Amino acid sequence: MIVSYQDMSAEPELANILQGLADETSTHKDVIYHVQRNQNARKSLAPTELLLNMTLLVTAGSETISSVLVTFMYNLCIHRDVYERLATMIRITFADPSDITLQELEGLVYFDACIKEALRIFPPVSSNLPREVPAKGAQVGPHFLPGGMLVSVAPWAAVRSKDNFHLPNEYHPERWLRNHPEHGWDPAFENDKLSASTPFGAGPKQCMGQNLSYYEIRLIVAHLLWVFDFELETEGVEGEKNRLWSLDPHFGLLRSFQTLNRPDLYIRFQERAGI
């Protein structure tokens, strides 16, 4: 009865929200407004489908990006050799932050390796992404999976497994430079199974916005590296809170509810002298 009552109470509010999103006179036309008016769509979405898609868009379109940015910045702060190399690269490549473009950033192989390693070591969606086995079933290695079964891989377990990665709990962008030895490939990572890191999912239903995610991460971090010098806060209350990121259970545990429930991160920023 309690669940039924909650559902009944939510329905009028949901109807009001959807009506507001469909308001033709509104000056703010968001993505749901345009989805509902797509003339090429086979049919409009039902209220429940709209609600599920709004939840997905908010989670995938904002929460994951902010998680990647925070974890990337954390790893740059604690791996000063990576920070110095990447900051020097950005500052030499671009004479002014206004010169920073996606086209130029895409050519920075080491920068991409740093991003991929940040996505690996702290996958923004660290809980399972279920997939349904086709009706005829599927053979996965020695195992036959019957049709209709839901299967998934735990991203955090996959990327932290020694079966898949050498030094799995350490941040090493070099592992992603196998095809670019001139940029510092380390043979110690020869046997890494890079395909085990799937931060955007895998197969035909992987995240359709992953390219946009890479664009946003490249642009934001490149501008931060060009304009600022920064380091992790290690003193006081903020420094104490930053210790949660070490994954040392003595300082507390990270939690994940579909996406990473990241703790606060405290960084000291100082504008570079002479710019």
Question: Where are the regions that the model predicts?
Answer:
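C-terminal helix/juxtamembrane-tail motif
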Residues: F257-I275
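Cytochrome P450 I-helix active-site segment
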Residues: S26-K29, C77-V125, G141, P146-M149, ...
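Active-site-adjacent bridging/hinge elements
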Residues: A41-P47, E182, D186-P199
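Short, small-residue alpha-helix embedded
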Residues: T64-C77, I220
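Conserved cytochrome P450 catalytic core segment spanning the I/J/K helices
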Residues: I2-V68
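C-terminal, well-structured subdomains that either form a transmembrane helix-short loop-helix hairpin
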Residues: E49, N53-L56, S62, Q139-F144, ...
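Conserved cytochrome P450 K-helix/beta-meander segment immediately N-terminal to the heme-binding cysteine loop
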Residues: V153-P187
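Cytochrome P450 heme-binding "Cys pocket" and the immediately downstream C-terminal segment
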Residues: R80-Y83, D192-K193, Q206, Q210-S256
